UniProtKB/Swiss-Prot annotation:
It is found in: Cytoplasm. PROSITE patterns: S1. The keyword Ion transport does not apply. This is Exosome complex component Csl4. It comes from Saccharolobus solfataricus (strain ATCC 35092 / DSM 1617 / JCM 11322 / P2) (Sulfolobus solfataricus). Keywords: Cytoplasm, Exosome, Metal-binding, Zinc.
Length: 189
């Protein structure tokens, strides 16, 4: 019998059928319980079942508990943006998860274009609205929005100037964004 919480790959032996029955993410072959998916082993001692919690399932459990996620804006259309979720709260993800941000979920104020509030390459702090694919995000709340951005003219770091504007310290360019509470301010804070 393998160790609880250990990483397993499909086809690997977990237990014999006399010890544990098959559960989620497992199958039985010639009296041996084997992993059906990549994930962590979980033995249900009460029901005597051998389970494998797939990484997708584990990530979704973390997403449901998360207060916020960190994402990078990949592409923008007229009414939405495609975002790669790269972190759940303060923890980074090994591989990004795709999500989308609809224009109606950007601000409580009317905006005509997604680019009035975010730009490609911006790092945003967002909240999940759905836990099924496609994942939907919102940045409407006061503490959510852009937390890291670069100047569209020279590529230098933008610093928060006021409630809606960011200023480039190199070229002086001023850009408008929906700014989150952790946006870089003058002095690097």
């Amino acid at each position: 019998m393998r160790t609880q919480g250990e990483l397993t790959l499909p086809g690997e032996e977990l237990a014999v059928i006399e010890e544990f029955m098959t559960g989620d993410g497992t199958y039985e072959q010639n009296g041996i319980v084997r992993a059906a998916v990549v994930g962590k082993i979980f033995y249900d001692m009460l029901n005597r079942k051998s389970n494998v919690l797939g990484f997708k399932k584990i990530i979704f459990q973390h997403l449901k508990k998360a207060k916020y996620v960190i994402g990078i804006v990949n592409s923008i259309k007229e009414d939405s943006a495609l975002v790669s979720i790269v972190g759940i709260e303060e923890r980074g993800l090994a591989s990004p998860i795709s999500a989308y941000l609809h224009i109606s979920q950007i601000s409580n104020k009317k905006i005509n274009n997604v680019t009035d509030a975010i730009k490609i390459g911006d790092v945003i702090k967002a909240k999940l609205l759905s836990y099924t694919f496609p994942l939907a995000l919102t940045i409407k709340m006061k503490d959510l929005g852009v937390i890291y951005a670069r100047c569209s003219r020279c590529g230098y770091l933008l610093i928060k100037q006021d409630e809606n504007n960011l200023k480039c310290q190199r070229c002086g360019n001023i850009e408008q964004r929906k700014i989150g509470s952790y946006m870089v301010k003058k002095g690097g804070n």
